[in-house]
Design a protein with these regions (language model features):
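Active-site loop/lid in soluble adenylation, ligation, and acyl-transfer enzymes
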Residues: 1-133
Length: 134
């Protein structure tokens, strides 16, 4: 296994079978020790959040599979906080899919004129954005 990329919340490794291993970390985006899902830097560590994020990812990949939608997901190991995926060629720096259940972080910075911080987003709000390296 060879480290090929270190991200804010995951490290990416190449595997001998040409697949890719994602190692979910307990690091969170935020600022000055305060969690903020819209921040572009690591601001704190929360023990167990890597595994929680992996469990959430598995859930959504399984829903996609059940709906007959193909993905790059191969398998996961919750104890090790790892996910094996097929290699993929990304557009630019990749696409980010964000599911928000509460209005906070960058969502409030963009839409705070219309909604209060902490407001539950009934049914969730999903947005797709291009990743930037800013």
């Amino acid at each position: 296994m060879k480290l090929i990329y270190q991200g804010k919340t995951k490290n990416v490794y190449s595997l001998d079978n040409d697949n890719v291993m994602l190692k979910f970390k307990d690091d969170c985006t935020g600022k000055d020790g305060v969690f903020d899902p819209g921040e572009n830097s690591v601001g704190l560590t929360i023990e167990g959040i890597g595994k929680a994020n992996l469990i959430s990812s598995i859930h959504y990949f399984e829903l996609l599979k059940k709906a007959g939608i193909k993905t790059h997901y191969v398998s996961a190991n919750v104890e090790d906080a790892t996910m094996e995926v097929l290699p993929a060629t990304t557009f630019g720096h990749g696409i980010e899919v964000i599911c928000r259940l509460v209005a906070t972080g960058s969502f409030i910075r963009r839409y705070g004129e219309y909604i209060k911080d902490g407001t539950p987003l009934e049914g969730g709000y999903v947005e797709c954005t291009f990743k930037t390296m800013l």
